[in-house]
């Protein structure tokens, strides 16, 4: 079946220190609030999960709890900081990284760590209820338009889906190139899981500049 989607668009003025429920539909809920630092947060939940998305700060997923278990890394940040510097706000679960660059800038280069996406200020944001072949879902999404007069003009549109009675969330991403020339891009879905006691990290990439 084709996807069905009913959107509720919102804007920064909807967010304050008094939580505002933007959507309530059965087990689904979307609540807008503002942290003490001034950062906008959107708490979404179903019967099994709750997550906090930062709609105007790169659409980062700041926090996620599934089946009563916190999945988010422990850090020195108890809430998101009002900054655009990667290291000054490294506390969330998921960050979109890239697109025009992704690594650390050299001394003669000028671009932010992990590109422009982690702290992108989205022009279009929404929540809503949708349905596809997997069932009914709560959605949070938006579009970030990046313009550079000499090289780039693209739209980046992530969409986070939380399905009914499910402990699985899905991230869908669309990238649209507005120029006639091809768009060369780099992307990383940067996920910071909470460490599990006695866990073991398996690293398989060859350790040289060609593979890393």
Which positions does each model-derived feature cover?
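Surface-exposed acidic/polar loop and edge beta-strand patches at domain peripheries
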Residues: 1-164, 168, 181-186, 193-212
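Hydrophobic beta-strand positions in extracellular immunoglobulin-like domains
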Residues: 174-175
């Amino acid at each position: 079946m084709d996807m069905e989607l009913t959107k509720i668009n919102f804007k920064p003025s909807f967010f304050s220190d008094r939580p505002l429920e933007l959507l309530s539909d059965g087990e689904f809920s979307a609540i807008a609030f503002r942290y003490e630092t001034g950062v906008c947060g959107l708490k979404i939940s179903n019967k099994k999960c709750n997550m906090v998305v930062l709609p105007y700060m790169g659409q980062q997923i700041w926090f996620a709890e599934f089946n009563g278990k916190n999945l988010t890394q422990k850090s020195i940040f108890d809430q998101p900081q009002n900054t655009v510097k990667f290291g000054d706000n490294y506390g969330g679960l998921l960050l979109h990284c890239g697109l025009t660059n992704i690594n650390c800038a050299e001394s003669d280069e000028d671009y932010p760590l992990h590109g422009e996406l982690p702290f992108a200020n989205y022009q279009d944001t929404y929540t809503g209820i949708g349905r596809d072949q997997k069932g009914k879902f709560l959605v949070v999404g938006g579009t970030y338009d990046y313009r550079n007069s000499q090289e780039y003009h693209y739209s980046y549109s992530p969409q986070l889906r939380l399905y009914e009675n499910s402990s699985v969330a899905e991230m869908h991403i669309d990238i649209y190139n507005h120029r006639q020339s091809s768009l060369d891009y780099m992307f990383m879905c940067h996920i910071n899981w909470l460490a599990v006691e006695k866990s073991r990290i398996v690293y398989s990439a060859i350790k040289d500049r060609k593979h890393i």
